[in-house]
Amino acid sequence: MRQITDISQLKEAIKQYHSEGKSIGFVPTMGFLHEGHLTLADKARQENDAVIMSIFVNPAQFGPNEDFEAYPRDIERDAALAENAGVDILFTPDAHDMYPGEKNVTIHVERRTDVLCGRSREGHFDGVAIVLTKLFNLVKPTRAYFGLKDAQQVAVVDGLISDFFMDIELVPVDTVREEDGLAKSSRNVYLTAEERKEAPKLYRALQTSAELVQAGERDPEAVIKAAKDIIETTSGTIDYVELYSYPELEPVNEIAGKMILAVAVAFSKARLIDNIIIDIREMERI
């Protein structure tokens, strides 16, 4: 594995891959890698000739009340994990290289950002869109891999690729879970022992609602209530339980097409998110 920090060196490596006709799988991250990231790298390894992972803690996606400096960083640990996962190039640029001087052009994400977690993180997805546009232009990937754990981000990336006619295949990858269904997250370590026992109820709630739809329920409020009823048996505080079309993230008046049921729940020292994709068309084929 090569670790590259210099943009010009990355461009040379990409040029070489393209001259050899090699496909490139790209996994953008902010580092502090966990099993979810490594699953993305593994899938990219299976589907491409070369795998490039970036580690860049992007200052543009941190809000005024979010501590950019406190974000965990351990590049040596991450480099070892990336190499073991079969990554060919680990791109670790400096913020001064990614954002040299004043911006001449910026990006504002108009849709898909004012619901779910984006509602309380103004400007966050603008920062995501800016850095991904830069990274996509540098890496020129055949495919880009993102985890559905953050399904709203996947929806925003889908819109970015579509609106700017980027010749990139977006590959959403299912959430990696513990044996009891809890979505894997670095935040899980902040749960107390009792909260850790309760936390799998989030996914159980989502599954229950999906099963309700599969059984014929077509009232969005009933589907949402079924999930809420289960989550309310935990000690966590519900931030939201919401249902939207996917990936458009528009409100739904009836159960139809492809949708996302998403939840956010605050425990004493950890805020957990999870979601499930409900596709009526797929259910009708079963």
UniProtKB/Swiss-Prot annotation:
It comes from the Bacteria. ATP binds at residues 30-37, 147-150, 176, 184-187. Its EC number is 6.3.2.1. It catalyses: (R)-pantoate + beta-alanine + ATP = (R)-pantothenate + AMP + diphosphate + H(+). One of its GO terms (molecular function) is pantoate-beta-alanine ligase activity. Transmembrane segments: none annotated. It holds the Pfam family Pantoate_ligase. GO terms for cellular component: cytosol. Beta-alanine binds at residue 61. The active site is at residue 37. InterPro entries: Cyt_trans-like, Pantoate_ligase, Pantoate_ligase_C, Rossmann-like_a/b/a_fold. It is found in: Cytoplasm. Homodimer. The reaction proceeds by a bi uni uni bi ping pong mechanism. Catalyzes the condensation of pantoate with beta-alanine in an ATP-dependent reaction via a pantoyl-adenylate intermediate. Belongs to the pantothenate synthetase family. This is Pantothenate synthetase. The lineage of its organism: Bacteria, Bacillati, Bacillota, Bacilli, Bacillales.
